[in-house]
Curated annotation (Swiss-Prot):
Its EC number is 2.1.1.14. Zn(2+) binds at residues 648, 650, 672, 733. The lineage of its organism: Bacteria, Pseudomonadati, Pseudomonadota, Alphaproteobacteria, Hyphomicrobiales. One of its GO terms (biological process) is methylation. L-homocysteine binds at residues 438-440, 491, 606. Its cofactor is Zn(2+). Disulfide bonds: none annotated. Binds 1 zinc ion per subunit. The gene is metE. L-methionine binds at residues 438-440, 491, 606. It catalyses: 5-methyltetrahydropteroyltri-L-glutamate + L-homocysteine = tetrahydropteroyltri-L-glutamate + L-methionine. Belongs to the vitamin-B12 independent methionine synthase family. This is 5-methyltetrahydropteroyltriglutamate--homocysteine methyltransferase. InterPro entries: Cbl-indep_Met_Synth_N (IPR013215), Cobalamin-indep_Met_synthase (IPR006276), Met_Synth_C/arc (IPR002629), UROD/MetE-like_sf (IPR038071). It is an enzyme of class 2 (transferase).
């Protein structure tokens, strides 16, 4: 019989219950309410999937912060600064994720970076030749037993040993973490044995790194690892799960040869591997087909998915085929049930996590009982696709004409950077090592209440404007008092750097409860790009104009770039992403023009998501980077030479895209570097990056206030790599999620660190 499965399920709860519980724990320190909430969310997830008839329900996919952090704890790979070897309690767990600063310790958090090309973030493991492993965290075993006690037989999920080591960071130059495989495997073998003893029959081992382009040496280490794992608990059936794309030929060959019972392949983003997989699958293996998109919110084309499933069953037999989501459903919102205000027609085109469970059930029934058993569902699905295809709301002829008429040679600024830099320095007269922030400032409950009051109609526009202007003035005066050189208005009016703009652009729609986990307690509510994009009126001009009127210091106009808006939205799937991005770029260009006309001399267009859009296969990079950089330049090319264009990027490795970053031709780029101790700057040095750079000198994802000496040390590291006249001083990222006291304290220390270095170099 053909079974259904999911690889993982949303963790935060339908109403962000996990976020509330985490923030309460971080404030009050009481463990019991947090653990009770976590248990409740796990149980609800298992029961919901069981009710929908999912055959293989995952366990250990839930986490309090991050599943890679859980694996760090499981294997005892705790860095020395967090009391490695001691019991891993909640305080240690969260210190690794967020840093810790109290009367007994002051430790920086571990690095965090993007999970492949998604907007989820994982904690980066740290490995050295001295790293040792031990089974230090039995969560995978405990949660299997917890589900079993509820009458739910689950398939435990582990981050695979190969991907765990590949995703880590070597703390010693030249060291390959894969060399630790021999030390790591006994921990996995122990876990598998204990899961078998607890009654597990299948275990899902995620190896998403197999989707990357790997060398023969890496693949050999993967094969050797699974030879050991398969022998550890012979009664267990291992399912190696890959996702986010097609496996390269050598990786697919390796996966098919692994001594495991099943292979999961993504058939949404990796449809090209379907035929090869069917022909190469050994007779002793099961093929899990990822037919339902786990990363986007559009309904599945049931006819196309069923055709793939039917052919697989015909070729392999029903007992050797499983129907699944392409990847974990943590990347989509929980359920459409709570979306009471979403347009009914648009809503009919969508499927969130719970609806995707229903799609899996329908597909499985169609395979098991034949097409006629789901003829009604197939007809309804086909009608929805036809209605969406022909809906006038998704097509805007004026937008399409404007994109069609773009001059491919007119996306550059008037003069080269060296000339612009001289013109801008004369205009602004900034000191060496100018200080600024990335854009957002802390948002209090009063700010959030003000936005809610306007939405509910409790406040009129005049009341709302008065409140926001007071917040902006407070932020401007604080920055002046601290001594920052370039100011921002603080963005109190913005819920999110993408949602805010989407609400003001045509072609976007919004959910009420469409929250998706970004990391830990951080959730985002991605807009839905359903149609052609245009800007009906200015979006930010009045707030920025007001902020600049309050001070003689330059204030940056703050925009989100077209690539980031694209990457952090649920994007229409009926046209190339590059086409949608060009539409957004033209809308942002109109805003740049209006900001400049309103007197803003500095405009920041943030592109933190530029790198995460890279295809996982390098052979596809050039095409993506060409249109992504073109879209950024298209959005800023109307700016005059005396207008300084800033951009910001975070969570990025820049070595392999440094040419593209230079091709953006932003006057100033600020980047997140504090957790990496300025190592990310090496790419800019090696490339001789010509423009100004603001390396982040403190980690805003942690509540700790860094000491002045700590930031000064980082600035000195930057000054060893770059000419001081091209260095800006700023935090790693925006400050929205921090509190006002810690923000002010950290910025005071940052400004003093910059002044101290200025004095030291005689600037």
């Amino acid at each position: 019989m053909t079974l259904t499965s999911t690889l993982g399920y949303p963790r935060v709860g339908p109403h962000r219950e996990l976020k509330a519980a985490l923030e309460t724990y971080w404030r009050d320190g009481e463990e019991a309410p947090l653990l009770d909430t976590a248990k409740s969310l796990r149980r609800a997830s298992w029961r919901l999937q069981k009710e929908h008839g999912i055959g293989h329900i995952p366990s250990n996919d839930f986490t309090l912060y991050d599943h890679v952090l859980d694996t760090i704890c499981m294997t005892g790979a705790v860095p020395e600064r967090f009391a490695a070897g001691a019991e891993i309690d909640l305080a240690t767990y969260f210190a690794m994720a967020r840093g810790a600063q109290d009367g007994t310790r002051d430790v920086a958090a571990m690095e965090m970076t993007k999970w492949f090309d998604t907007n989820y973030h994982y904690i980066v493991p740290e490995f050295s030749p001295e790293t040792n492993f031990r089974l230090a965290f039995t969560k995978a075993i405990d949660e299997f037993a917890e589900a079993k006690a509820l009458g739910v037989h689950t398939r435990p999920v582990l981050v695979g040993p190969f991907s765990f080591l590949k995703l880590g960071k070597a703390t010693v130059a030249g060291f390959d973490p894969l060399d630790l495989m021999g030390r790591l495997l006994p921990v996995y073998e122990n876990v598998l044995k204990r899961l078998a003893e607890a009654g597990a029959d299948w275990v899902q081992i995620d190896e998403p790194c197999l989707v990357l382009e790997l060398g023969s040496g890496d693949l050999a280490k993967c094969r050797a690892a699974y030879s050991a794992l398969s022998a550890a608990a012979p009664s267990l059936k291992l399912m190696v799960a890959t996702y986010f794309g097609a496996l390269p030929e050598a990786s697919l060959e390796t996966a098919m040869a692994l001594p495991v019972a099943g292979i999961h392949l993504d058939m949404v983003r990796g449809r090209s591997q379907y035929e090869a997989a069917l022909s190469a699958l050994p007779r002793d293996k099961l093929l899990s087909l990822g037919l339902v998109d786990g990363r986007n919110i559009w309904r599945t084309d049931m006819e196309a998915a069923l055709t793939l499933a039917e052919r697989a069953v015909l070729t392999l037999g029903p007992k050797r085929v499983m129907i699944s989501a392409a990847c974990s459903l943590l990347h989509v919102p929980f359920s459409l049930a709570g979306e009471k205000s979403l347009d009914p027609e648009l809503k009919s085109w969508l499927a969130f996590a719970e609806e995707k469970l229903g799609e899996l059930a329908v597909l499985a029934r169609g395979v098991k009982e034949g097409r006629t058993s789901i003829s009604t569902e197939l007809a309804e699905n086909a009608a929805l696709f036809e209605a969406r295809r022909n809906s006038p709301r998704i097509h805007n002829p004026a937008v399409r004409a404007r994109v069609r008429d773009i001059d491919p040679h007119a996306d550059r600024r008037g003069r080269p950077f060296a000339d612009r830099q001289s013109i801008q320095q004369k205009r602004f007269g900034l000191p060496k090592l100018p200080t600024t922030t990335i854009g957002s400032f802390p948002q209090t409950s009063d700010v959030r209440k003000a936005r809610a009051s306007l939405r509910r109609g409790d406040w009129n526009e005049a009341q709302y404007d008065a409140f926001m202007k007071a917040e902006i003035e407070k932020t401007i005066r604080l920055q002046e008092r601290i001594g920052l050189d370039v100011l921002v208005h603080g963005e109190p009016e913005r819920t999110d750097m993408v949602e805010y703009f989407g609400e003001k652009l045509e072609g976007f729609a919004f959910t009420s409860l469409g929250w998706v986990q970004s990391y830990g307690s951080r959730c985002v509510k991605p807009p839905i790009i359903f149609g052609d994009v245009s800007r009906p009126e200015p979006m930010t001009v009045e707030w920025s104009r007001y902020a600049q009127s309050l001070t003689d210091r330059p204030v940056k106009g703050m925009l989100t770039g077209p690539v980031t808006i694209l990457q952090w939205s649920f994007v229409r799937d009926d046209q190339p992403r590059s086409e949608t991005c060009r539409q957004i770029a033209l809308a942002i260009r109109d805003e740049v023009y209006d900001l400049e006309a309103a007197g803003l001399g500095m405009i920041q267009i943030d592109e933190p998501a530029l790198r995460e859009g890279l295809p996982l296969h390098r052979s596809e990079w050039d095409t993506y980077l060409r249109w992504a950089c073109e879209c950024f330049r298209l959005s800023v090319c109307v700016a005059r030479d005396e207008t300084q264009i800033h951009t910001h990027m975070c969570y990025s490795e820049f070595n392999d895209i440094i040419e593209a970053i230079a091709d953006l031709d932003a006057d100033v780029i600020s980047i997140e570097t504090s957790r990496s101790r300025m190592e990310l700057l090496d790419a800019f040095v090696d490339f001789s990056y010509p423009n100004d750079i603001g390396p982040g000198v403190y980690d805003i994802h942690s509540p700790r206030v860094p000491a002045r000496g700590e930031m000064l040390s980082l600035l000195r590291l930057a000054a060893e790599r770059l000419p001081s006249e091209r260095i800006w001083v700023n935090p790693d990222c925006g400050l929205k999620t921090r509190g006002w006291p810690e923000t002010e304290a950290a910025l005071v220390e940052m400004v003093e660190a910059a002044r101290e270095l200025r004095n030291a170099i005689g600037a």
